[in-house]
Amino acid sequence: MKPDNVLSAKNRNELRQWLEHNHLTEKECWVAVKRGRPTSDDVFWYVDAVEEALCFGWIDSTTKTLQDGVTYQKLAPRKKGSLWSELNKERCRRMDKLGMMTEYGRAVLPDMTPAGFVIDDDILAALQTDDVVWSNFQSFPELYQRVRIDTIQIKKKQPKL
């Protein structure tokens, strides 16, 4: 069964135009996207859809792959108080630097300061138990550390993921 409110957007510009006109009135939309590392301008990539959604205070959620093999990504307004991944925070920082964030996207941002992310004590203790592991972890770029640890912490708090 095809989801409701499927957009015909074929790229980020078309999605952005739709969001500009509808982000305050619509409850959701679905876009056909491809996951993976972008390799072609002729494909609407998942990351492009997510970045555009974030610019308007929206977020990705459910995906559906239909019998024809097309994957649809659901986009919807972000709920107040919802969890933010470090990856999406970084996407917002990037979109802001590029001048693409809207006032609506900025209005829903969480604490974006370095103090806004703290490694859980039990995870930190586990990393520090082994000197080699801790040394390797510290050699990773700071963003990589935050994104990887955040993924673990989110899954720890939401086991259904």
Whereabouts are the PLM-identified features?
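Charge-dense, helix-prone N-terminal extensions
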Residues: 1-161
